[in-house]
Amino acid sequence: MHLERDKVYDAPEGEVWSTVKPASTHNSAAPKRLAQRWNHRWSDESLTQGVSPLKDSSKTVKASTTIPLGTGRPTALYYPWQSVSMAGTEASRQPRGLKPTLAGNMTCSKGEAAFDLSSALNYGEPSGWSQLVAFFRETTGRVHRPPYADWDTTLTCGSTSAVDLVLRMFCNRGDCVLAERFTYPGTLMASRAQGLRTVGIAMDADGLVPEALDAALRGWDAASRGRKPFVLYTIPSGHNPTGVTQSAARKRAVYQVAERHDLLIVEDDPYFFLRLGRGGGGESLPTSYLSLDTAGRVVRVESTSKILAPGLRCGWLTASRQVVDMFGNFAEVGPSSPAGPSQAMLYKLLVESWGPEGFAGWLDYLSGEYGRRRDVMVAACERHLPREVCAWTAPTHGMFLWVGAALERHPRYQESGARDQDRDADADAELCRAVEDGICARAEANGVLVARGSWCRVGGGADRAFFRMTFVATAEAADLERGVAQFGRAVRDEFGLG
């Protein structure tokens, strides 16, 4: 089976994604508009980026009668693998908490009609193997229902790689990128490596604050700060590191600001499917920016890392056809596509074994397991963390708990004697780092690792020390209790609470 680009995976009839609340109000009977063009926003690198002539010419080597003397692809006769076998998990829609059972073996062989191992071991298309792309395109269409006509989906080598390429596509050295006040450190590192500056936008309990975003753009001084930023990077569900999930109303307000200032929204959403509920139960999937996007100004980035396995190094990206095509040009001379064996594993599991129903069932199961672990960690925090110093909010999506420690309760802060209006911001930032270092050193000495909030902070200033704790990384849920207890002891020692 080889599906052409514009075709979709032939999913079974029935509503698989029954927990999805459609965000788009677009009349499905009315024609959808085409996405806006982004020629005015391409980076200098994009303007000089073309299609690799060697790789482009190899696409024509399809017919068995063609003698491929111009390619650099060795014949499959000399690949030492004849077949690859794997055992997967049986997943279906079932009561939450019921552990999936072991499924039968899945085999990918040379010459196989559905997914030829010879093809998986050869150079692949930058967009990924069509059968697998079709599955993710179909999933995207059913879940998000993009309300414009010319959207498309491509595979990526994971979210970090995808975001790095998107920044290269739109930004020049010296440009500024907008992001939440706290954000994923990998994106901060990628931005710095490209010579970009990240501008932090205020957050509240619903995530990114649209009024703060609008104010930052309205008051932008191009003479002193360079050209006005037009790329907004956001992690809307189970935000890394804060755990916050943006409400549908919040996303609509942010999207309106994006329309007003002609922003491109990079929606990095690896935790979208991990809905934990407020008491261990499931919730509907969040409204996505993609589902609100009527003009093709959203680049949605998703990943298999948090829902299947990080080592697959595979994700998928959805955007307008123009943006997806440019992404493919960058991928051809960069990371290319995910490794063929990874794609074969995904195809055998998602398409041949699970299908959409099984995939949805697996995500239900995973969400239930993560929700229970979240509850264990939150309960441990209630028992072991000093409330007079620490604050946290149980996340409804994702895998992180964000704990803040009030600096004004620290002995060094109180010893300074300065009133709030007289405090030195640099001194407070230094104290914040010292408190983080002290707590982390004590915790590590007792065998517990937590992530420092300063690694995720955009810009300076601090009135709290923050720590990110993951509740899905331990093999045993009981380790969460012991880990939080040791972390709580480290906080008490650092703040002199005995």
UniProtKB/Swiss-Prot annotation:
InterPro entries: Aminotransferase_I/II_large, Class-I_PLP-dep_aminotransf, PyrdxlP-dep_Trfase, PyrdxlP-dep_Trfase_major. GO terms for molecular function: 2-aminoadipate transaminase activity; aromatic-amino-acid transaminase activity; pyridoxal phosphate binding. Disruption phenotype: Impairs the production of 1-oxoindolizidine, (1S)-1-hydroxyindolizin, and (1R)-1-hydroxyindolizine and completely abolishes the production of swainsonine. Its cofactor is pyridoxal 5'-phosphate. Pathway: Mycotoxin biosynthesis. Pfam families: Aminotran_1_2. It comes from the Eukaryota. Keywords: Aminotransferase, Pyridoxal phosphate, Transferase. One of its GO terms (biological process) is tyrosine biosynthetic process. It is an enzyme of class 2 (transferase). Its EC number is 2.6.1.-. Aminotransferase; part of the gene cluster that mediates the biosynthesis of swainsonine (SW), a cytotoxic fungal alkaloid and a potential cancer therapy drug. Swainsonine production occurs via a multibranched pathway and is dispensable for fungal colonization of plants and infection of insect hosts. The first step of swainsonine biosynthesis is the production of the precursor pipecolic acid (PA) via conversion of L-lysine (Lys) to 1-piperideine-6-carboxylate (P6C) by the aminotransferase swnA, the latter being further reduced to PA by the reductase swnR. Belongs to the class-I pyridoxal-phosphate-dependent aminotransferase family. This is Aminotransferase swnA. It comes from Metarhizium robertsii (strain ARSEF 23 / ATCC MYA-3075) (Metarhizium anisopliae (strain ARSEF 23)). The gene is swnA.
